[in-house]
Design a protein with these regions (language model features):
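Short amphipathic alpha-helical segments
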Residues: 57-59, 176-178, 219
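Substrate-engagement module of ASCE P-loop NTPases
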Residues: 81-87, 128-136, 192-198
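Catalytic core of nucleotidyl cyclases, primarily class III adenylyl/guanylyl cyclases
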Residues: 91-124, 139-186
Length: 255
């Protein structure tokens, strides 16, 4: 008779399955399924590595010119992404956010679902954005140094981590179909935040007017923002009526 006991090597064990879900969702999946779909106000966050595709193209050219095998050099990009995903997962969890999914070199997450006092959410979400931005620089430098020392190559393309944040309403919950189901957030505000991420450049943290207005109302607010007028040639698709966004540029040192 076959042994059906679950072991640590079983890909369907609880421990292994937990790697495919955000920790909060995995721990509360039964309750979330019973809750169905609900409207929630959340801080939506998208991260993306700017110019990552350009870096990949640059390395492909290098491989064709100088190397017979492309595996090793692209393994270094794999390790860079692994460190980035790991740091993002830790960062989001520690700030009580939910990591919805990795989207290539991008990340979709949201903050506020677990909080009763929403005022605390702002500092956690913005703090997560700043911390991940800072730590990504260390991750980037580590792996670019290896590319240089092991392969004698320093890429021309400079990658950075950009971020978009928006305060809005989403439809969050258990979305079912016979072939595949998912616990996620959808809605117009999610799409809008995704457009903001497309607007951001290099290592910018760009936020919506809605989030900026909310930050201004917080007691003892320490976050500094800069108003940005959207150029005509960079209008947000489907949201052309939006004239301004804001860039988070730091904290008030007086506090």
């Amino acid at each position: 008779m076959a042994n059906h006991n679950v072991t640590n090597n079983d890909p369907h064990s609880k421990e292994q399955l937990s790697m495919y879900f955000d920790p909060f969702i995995f721990s509360n999946i039964k309750e979330l399924k019973l809750d169905g779909i609900n409207i929630n106000q959340l801080i939506i966050v998208f991260w993306d590595i700017s110019k990552f595709s350009a870096l990949v193209k640059e390395l492909k050219v290098l491989v064709k010119k100088r190397m017979k095998k492309q595996g090793p050099i692209f393994h270094e990009l794999e390790y860079l992404l692994r460190d980035y995903y790991t740091e993002a997962t830790r960062n989001i969890k520690e700030n009580d956010g939910i990591l919805d999914k990795f989207i290539g070199d991008g990340i979709f997450s949201y903050f506020g679902y677990q909080e009763r006092e929403f005022d605390q959410v702002y500092s956690k979400a913005v703090g997560a954005a700043y911390e991940l931005k800072t730590n990504f620089v260390k991750i980037k430098e580590k792996h670019l140094k290896i590319l240089c020392s092991h392969y004698g190559y320093r890429p021309i393309t400079d990658i950075n981590l950009k971020c978009a944040m928006h305060l809005g309403e989403v439809l969050f919950g258990y979305w079912y179909s016979p072939l595949r189901s998912q616990i996620t957030a959808i809605g117009d505000d999610v799409n809008f935040c995704s457009r903001i991420e497309g607007f951001a450049e290099n290592d910018q943290i760009i936020i919506s007017k809605e989030l900026n207005d909310a930050l201004r109302k917080i007691n003892n607010n320490t976050f500094k923002t800069k108003k940005i007028k959207i150029p005509e040639d960079k209008k947000l698709k489907t949201y052309e009526h939006v004239k301004y966004l804001y860039e988070l540029i730091g904290k008030d040192k007086k506090n």
